Amino acid sequence: MVDKLKSYTKEDLIASGRSELFGENGPPLPSGNMLMMDRIIEMTENGGTHDKGYIEAELDITPDLWFFDCHFIDDPVMPGCLGLDAMWQLVGFFLGWLGGEGKGRALGVGEVKFTGQVLPTAKKVTYRINFKRVINRKLIMGLADGEVLVDGKIIYTATDLKVGLFKDTSAF
């Protein structure tokens, strides 16, 4: 049984990447540079706009983050796909938090809109995930809407983020 904490530290998230948080069969988060959050500040099983679950997480922005050096030279900006991936990471984390087992895989997104950017001068990115549905049968899948904010301003929105958990990904 998974301890359902309401918040998680960076150390907890790193432990998830080593399969130490939700057990050896739980979905791990990415590790290293691909872990796109520093903390989860709120998790609820019944909250959010659809009353099906909610997560809020944060990433501290500093000018020395790895992607600013290569995307782009003389025009540093966080790649939008990393914000989208962070939202998928959080959907998968939620499924593990609920006790789901397997390896997480992004399955799609309905629509993504970018209306701003993350520059090295920013201080904090906030991710908000509102769950619409969780299927927990033979297939374990989360469906959610998400927002990415930079310093309190919404800059990306995504509808129908889909993540599934798979016991065997060899034929995926």
UniProtKB/Swiss-Prot annotation:
One of its GO terms (biological process) is unsaturated fatty acid biosynthetic process. Signal peptide: none annotated. The active site is at H71. One of its GO terms (molecular function) is (3R)-hydroxyacyl-[acyl-carrier-protein] dehydratase activity. The keyword Cytoplasm applies. SUPFAM superfamilies: Thioesterase/thiol ester dehydrase-isomerase (SSF54637). Its EC number is 4.2.1.59, 5.3.3.14. It catalyses: a (3R)-hydroxyacyl-[ACP] = a (2E)-enoyl-[ACP] + H2O; (3R)-hydroxydecanoyl-[ACP] = (2E)-decenoyl-[ACP] + H2O; (2E)-decenoyl-[ACP] = (3Z)-decenoyl-[ACP]. This is 3-hydroxydecanoyl-[acyl-carrier-protein] dehydratase. It comes from Photorhabdus laumondii subsp. laumondii (strain DSM 15139 / CIP 105565 / TT01). The lineage of its organism: Bacteria, Pseudomonadati, Pseudomonadota, Gammaproteobacteria, Enterobacterales.
